[in-house]
Amino acid sequence: MFGLFLLASVLLLGLIIAELLVGGGNVTLSDVLQAPSRPQSLAQIIIETIRLPRALAAVLVGAALAAAGVIMQTVLRNPLAAPDILAVTSGAQLALIIASLLLPFAFPGFLATILGGAIGGGLCLLVGGGLRAQPVRLALAGVAISLAFSALSSAIVLMADDRASGILLWSSGLLEQSGWTRVASLAPAILAGILLLALLGRQFDVMALGNDMASGLGLGKAPAIIGLLATVVLSGAAVSIAGPIGFIGLAVPNFLRAVGFHKHGLLLPAAGLLGAVALLAADVAAQLLSSPGTIIPAGVFAACFAAPVLILVLRRIKGETRTRANVVSQKVLFQRKTVLYPVLAGLMVAAFLLGLLFGDGVAGWQTDWNTVYALRMPRVLIAMGAGALLACAGLLLQLVTRNPLSGPETLGLSQGAALAGLAGLLIGVVPGSPLFALLALLGAGLVVLCISLLSIRMSPERTALTGIAVAASLAALSTIIVIEAKLQVAEALSWLAGSTHGRNWQDVTALAPWLVLIPLMMILARWFDILAMGRDEAESIGLNTMSARIWTMLLASLAVAGAVATVGAIGFVGLIAPHAARLCSGARYRQLVPVTALIGAILTAFADMFGRTLIAPQEIPTGIVTAFIGAPLFILLMRRQSR
């Protein structure tokens, strides 16, 4: 253990020196060594006002997040617990954005992050099952709440207009500092929080023995409450300094416990030291990879490692090895299809007409018809077509995985297709072209293969969490491509969130051939019914289940590729629409496929309309609206699945 402390200390010193050297300004090692004796030099000014505050910010934020992760995992007895996983970070981020943009004089920024972090963490515990909730369920609840908070944060940021670019960078986890103000004001809170946790180290050691043992030794609830409050303060301070940065609080404590650190008297200082090293290393690497004139936030670079870290932690958790779950709804609202289809048709017509009626204002039919035809109608049609494709893709994914929590977004297919599409843009592929769609298909297909291999013998909850981790890593890589390629950041991130903005009749023409997949799925409905019976029954009837599963996954990947190539990664439609369809029409795929397509089209069309009108003349990307609606529904599905 002493060797690890020594190694981490040497690495910390080396990384601090590296932090002072990288970046703009051409600072050399000689300048760093001679800075104290050359107080008026340009290099000394750069080091003192930019580089040193940034290095100290990385040390403080990394230490705070790692220490918070240690205590969360101890108190909750959950190796998946971390500020970013349990919605503390996203709650603090949302609160700080509200305080900065909407209520600038209501709360100081640091107080806002504490309140927001406490609300986020409290909601996570409330919907996830409390302090003794099952680990994966609590983590999924936190992720769902984080998605809803992030969607709301993005919507507020879009209203900021000229301030959006800077806030978008901060929201990605940016350590860059302009002077010592933030670091100096928040360093005492971080140091005091870590010191308080260290003083309670013995109580946390007792807590780690288990509830019965801790109660028998007379340990009350006060240390747990104090510990969780301290983690909220540490997380809030970290967000105030650098924005939301993930996976430091998850990876560092799990690594230290894996190598033998269990007593909190050693675990906490080791976590603080290693957390500082990890974040410094991420920031140095991000700056080295940044081309001149670009900034890769350290938080984005750290998020690239989300999938491997979370998958390794999931592998360490024992139990919960249910391999498959039933995705069939037991209750059917519409027993008579002569009622269901007219209702859906009416909603479809209403969504279409309202989409034409409302644009970037409330002028309605007073708007010139040529404007409606040229600008609004293509967007409405594309929203409906993409929603239908994503919904049917989710239906097939839930069939193949027998997992009610599966969807293009929870398994990472949408993000994989979007990443491949962005890579195509870098080599000159035209969006909407067949080659662009082929690249999106390749990205989605590779993710399907990856998730299929990783989720063997996993429970539905673990599979969903694995897919979300893969999606986070792919989204981070997409952000790096956007930054490095010097694309229009706001527009590119809007497309990544899923948007119909700027779509025209040419895009409608490009999307139309993909809609052939829906009648093809209807033709194959009997296959799907047999496949839904289970492997043994399906093979006894004569169906080659392996071949059927491969073709079904290919169909799902094709549907995702067609939608993402046109509108980007719209989330939650493919997760929610199939469940709504089962509730409306039952389990037979001959009815499920068209009903799912109609519900997906209706949901996406309404989301697009609300996105265009809620904060007009600005727009909220369709994917943000669906995420804000879908995240609570995802929590309901998860709670239903856990029963």
Language-model regions, residue ranges each:
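Alpha-helical transmembrane segments in inner-membrane proteins
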Residues: M1-R643
